[in-house]
Amino acid sequence: MAVYKVSFLAHLLVLGMYLLVSTVEHANACTKECGNLGYGICPGSEGSPENPICTNCCSGYKGCNYYYANGTFICEGTSDPKNPNICPSYCDPQIAYSKCPRSEGKTIIYPTGCTTCCTGYKGCYYFGQDGEFVCEGESIEPKGCTKECDPRVAYMTCPSSGLAKLNQVCVNCCSAGEGCKLYDNDGSLLCTGEPQSISTA
């Protein structure tokens, strides 16, 4: 009798752990909806001793450090992308280059496509169509997309399929492949898949 009791408890424990892992994975995945963002600002490292940038400590971004051509630190930027400083527009001839947390990629993201606050990069700031600050990105790396089917999707076309209509597909705006276009029943474009979209297993 004791053996059956232990076995039953062991099964309950395994089931509980499985449910917990599934819940955590689902919570970490971003939703299927696209954001309605206007643009994003991702301060990135710019310039070099041979190709200096045009900026100054006032207009330089917070979190970015600015240096002389010989590598000596000058200042940290003081302008918050959420609420930029009103600064003189002159170039400080002493500043040659900057080092920022996100050292790769574009500084200005426009348009943002299907990016949301969840899938946007940490250290990037996202703004609405009206130019008002919306959020800072939450992902250190692109977050996994939920595999939930978006019921609005009637068909999609993808470059890999020669743009033929693919019907009865289980997909959403986050998990769609790069360049794939999702359409609703009346033929209106819902969204276009982006390179950063990855799906969870």
Curated annotation (Swiss-Prot):
Residues 1-23 form the signal peptide. Keywords: Disulfide bond, Protease inhibitor, Repeat, Serine protease inhibitor, Signal. Disulfide bonds join 30-118, 34-114, 42-124, 54-91, 57-75, 58-87, 64-100, 117-135. The record marks 32-33, 147-148 as: Reactive bond for trypsin. Induction: By viroid infection. The keyword Repeat applies. The keyword Cell membrane does not apply. InterPro entries: Prot_inh_I20 (IPR003465), Protease_inhibitor_I20 (IPR051391). Sequence repeats lie at residues 27-83, 84-143, 144-199. GO terms for molecular function: serine-type endopeptidase inhibitor activity. Pfam families: Prot_inhib_II. It comes from the Eukaryota. Belongs to the protease inhibitor I20 (potato type II proteinase inhibitor) family. This is Proteinase inhibitor type-2 CEVI57. The gene is CEVI57.
